[in-house]
Amino acid sequence: MNQNKNNNNKNPKINLLIIGCGCIGLSTGIIALKSGNYKSVSIWAKDLPPNTTSNKAAALWYPFLCNPLDLVGKWSAETMQYYKDHIINDPKSGTITKKVNEIFRRPHPEDPEWKPYIKSFRRARKDELPDGYVDGYAIDDGFVMDTDMYMDYLVDQFKSLGGIIEQRHLVDIREAFVDHDVVVNCTGLGSRELFNDRTIYPGRGQIIVIKNSTDRSIMDEEDHIAYVIPRLTNTVLGGTNQEHDYNTNPTKKDTEEILKRVAMISPRFAKNRIEIQGVKVGLRPARHEIRLENEFFEGGSKLVVHNYGHGGSGFTVSWGCAIEAIKLVDQGLPKLLHFNKLISKL
């Protein structure tokens, strides 16, 4: 999709509403505004930065806890390219390039399904493997985001392009339909209630933010989750993925277990060598696969484009999914407009 403004879209301009103000909703809004195809673009959300799930994420570019893997690969590659073209050179974004290693204690001869989409993918060298690890992957040009800086950056970008943000909690999608014919649903876990999607559930993630730093991200998700993610101003240690757990309070038990696992993949981050700055908990929008599709309501007179269920890969697929979501809006508009034209003649 062309990120520059264009008037090639033959559909009449409409007022577009996006529900949700995490990295998915904001990215989608920015892509919509850059297209120049909409009369206005607004975001309604129950929670705004810095109080979103996105603000509590480790924010490493790497496909993680997300399906379907073939499309995740495509959207991840598109997101990586967007970071390179539009974000990485802006210091206000809090985004930096860091090498990423995923490591394995057992031989892992198969490559990930998303490998064909990532040109920089390679097998890890022996010198990149900690003691006790025998195999691994490497990406030399991955990205990490300081989440608070990055989310503020997205808000500023959205508003500077003319976007409007309103803190508003929807309990019924029909509230949105009063003034909008097209809505993009980026509510994540909120889709469980707003759209009665019982296939989405929380994947509780707890992270530890420390002052120390390192030169690469490293992760082990083979048996238990352990990762070290150096960001611009701090480093994140993680983590957990406790399915169907709604507890948003940090627990001492999880903190202790995270520190033990992290010390195994990177001994320099043993408990007695780090300075803890904080502990955060976020609920990942876990689902069997990302939902990115059109759904018509009220007999075909209203269109909802769903863009949720990104699991642990929200920052990894955000721009690719945003581009796809706006394509779906444009594809659904002719049917919507045809239906409304017929109704107006009755």
Swiss-Prot record:
Q: What is its main location?
A: other
Classification via InterPro entries: D-amino_acid_oxidase_CS, DAO, FAD-dep_OxRdtase
What is the catalytic activity of this protein?
A: a D-alpha-amino acid + O2 + H2O = a 2-oxocarboxylate + H2O2 + NH4(+); D-serine + O2 + H2O = 3-hydroxypyruvate + H2O2 + NH4(+); D-phenylalanine + O2 + H2O = 3-phenylpyruvate + H2O2 + NH4(+); D-alanine + O2 + H2O = pyruvate + H2O2 + NH4(+)
Taxonomic superkingdom? Eukaryota
Q: Which cofactor does it need?
A: FAD
What EC identifiers does the entry list? 1.4.3.3
Q: Name one GO biological process term.
A: digestion
Q: Which UniProt keywords apply?
A: FAD, Flavoprotein, Oxidoreductase, Peroxisome
Compartments (UniProt record)? Peroxisome matrix
Q: Which residues bind FAD?
A: G22, I24, T52, T53, S54, A58, A59, L60, T187, R284, G311, G312, G314, T316
Keyword field contains Flavoprotein = yes
UniProt motif (Microbody targeting signal) ranges? 344-346
Enzyme class name: oxidoreductase
Binding positions for D-dopa?
Answer: R284, G312
Asked if Oxidoreductase is a keyword of the record, the answer is: yes
Gene Ontology cellular component?
cytoplasm; peroxisomal matrix
Amino acids binding D-proline: Y227, R284, G312
Q: Which PANTHER family match?
A: D-AMINO ACID OXIDASE, D-ASPARTATE OXIDASE
Function description? Catalyzes the oxidative deamination of D-amino acids with broad substrate specificity. Has low in vitro and no in vivo activity on D-serine; primary D-serine degradation is performed by the D-serine dehydratase dsd.
* The protein's name in its UniProt record: D-amino-acid oxidase
Could you tell me which species this protein originates from? Dictyostelium discoideum (Social amoeba)
Query: What is the primary gene name for this protein?
Result: ddo-1
